[in-house]
Structures are given as C-alpha cells and as structure tokens.
Amino acid sequence: MADIDDEDIKEILLTLPGWEVGKPLAPLDSHWDRQLDELIKYHRENGYGIYAKNIAFTWRDEEITPVNSIDPIRLTDLKNYELQRNKVIDNTESFIAGHPANNVLLYGDRGTGKSSTVHAILNEYWQKGLRMIEIPKSAVADLSLIREQIADSPMKFIIYIDDLSFDSNDTSFSELKAALEGSLSGKQPNTIIYATSNRRHLIKENFSDRENDVNKGDTMQEQLALSDRFGLTITFLNPDKKEYLDIVEKLACDRHFEEHGVDVDKLLFKADQWATRRGGRSPRGAKQFIDHVEGCIKRGKEW
C-alpha cells in the first residue's frame, strides 16, 4: 500500500464505471495516506454502507432493509413514567459504552408509551452509534442470521420486537430463548434485544393445554423462563385520573395552548370526558385528545 501514490489511484479511478455518487460520508484529502487514520476513526464511529446512512431498519426477505421515514418522537415528548424510562436510558447508555447491559422487556397496558420509549431512545442516541432493527415476531427464528449479518459492524444494534407473545403451540420461542441467553451463539457484544408486550408471561396457555399436559409444571416453568430471560423487565400501567390529567396539561404546555387562550379547567374537564368515552385513560389517549384540540384551534372550531 505504501508504494501506491496519487497518480496510481487516479489511473485506477479512471477504469471504474461512471457511478453517480453523493456527498462523501467522510472528509477526503488529496493525499489519501494522510487521511487513512481519520477514515478508520470515522467509520469505526459511524459505520459503513447502509449503517452510516440510516439509523433504523427492518428485517424483510432475509435482508436488513433501511427505513427511510422514522417516528421523530423524542424523550422530551413523553410525559411522566420517569422511573420506567430512566431504567431504559441507563441500560442503553451502558450498552453504547460497551459495558454490561441487559435485554429489556417493556410490558403493560396498551397506549402507555412502551413502543414510543424505544423509538425515542433511538432518536436520542443514534449519533453515538446506536442503530435499530425491528423484526416481526414471525422472524424470531432468524435472530441468529440477523446477528451474523451485523457481527462485524462497529455500530451498536437494538433488535426490536413489538407486541411480543406466543401461542403455546408456537415453537419459535425457543430461538428467542437461545438468543436471550444460554446458547453458544446467543451472546453478541454489539446487539441487544428490546421487546414490548401487553403480557407479562409471553406464552399464552389455553385450557386444553392444561387438561392434556401431564407435565403441566414443566410447561409452566418453560413459559415463565422465557420472560425471565430478559434481564430487565419494566412495567407500564395506565395512569389514574390525576396522572392522566397531568399528562394532558404537560402536552398542552408543549403545544403553547395558553397562547390561544385555552382555559385549563375546561381542557382538563374535556380530556376526562374524552377518556371516559374511549374506555380508559392512557398517555396515548391524552395525546390523541391534544391532537384533536390543536386541530380545532387551528381551524377556528369549537372543541
């Protein structure tokens, strides 16, 4: 390599096809040898190929595919649930720094911000080398293949599984158990698994299972073992009325409703009516109500 000079490189470049290229991902210098250390440092920090140009991916047809449009939500957009969220933040920061970190199960009521927390974590830490690959539950059996494809990348990857649960006759959960812990291929320093679920026990058991299984105790232990393989389990429950209205008020403050003369007492009264009509209080419901009010304000309509 030391015997190659700038003229040699120019001759090589002239033989290449006329590819259309965009802006270089790393700074270039006419004396490429002086830039070698900087290029190595740049790609060690920013990755290469699709991992340098994108931060979110899906698993499709046995390929890691970039996601061009991602949820822009930030941690500051999420209200309350600080204890739960801080546990995810601390674990993620430890993972990014190369320190021991746990696979995480976020479980609890619908609409409480489990998925939004994971999306916000990516938006907060992608500049520190964090990337995310979302896979459907049906692709759990491909976990070892996914990890193999990113094994040599310098980036840190959250493998994200949303709304995770299994039927009792679904054997693919064995692959997840192996990936979480226990198998020789189950550990990889640049990957971690974050999953969300509405169920604490991820494997659904039906009555026929209980009647027909003479080894019910062993079956139950196997089912419980899957949840226990997540080193960190974080619970998100629906807020009570006071907490719900507090979320509504904080979201209204972010949207500067006071500048439009919105009466706070009326806002909170209407917010509680909104929740009652929709069968319960949740952070998602609070945001939907605030979106409704903002839309009415901007159109000059009564809300």
Segments (PLM) and residue ranges:
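N-terminal pre-Walker A segment at the start of P-loop NTPase domains
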Residues: N68-E93
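Walker A/P-loop
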Residues: N103-I133, K137, L145-D152
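Interdomain "pre-motor" coupling segment immediately N-terminal to P-loop NTPase/helicase cores
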Residues: D6-P66
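Loop/turn-to-beta-strand initiation segments
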Residues: L130-R131, P154-I158, K187-Y194
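Conserved P-loop NTPase "ATPase switch" module shared by AAA+ and STAND
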Residues: P136-K137, D152-S172, L176, R199
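Conserved AAA+ ATPase "SRH/arginine-finger" region at the nucleotide-binding site
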Residues: D213-L224, G231-L245
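Conserved catalytic/switch belt of AAA+ P-loop NTPases
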Residues: S168-E211, D218
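C-terminal alpha-helical "lid" subdomain
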Residues: L237-W303
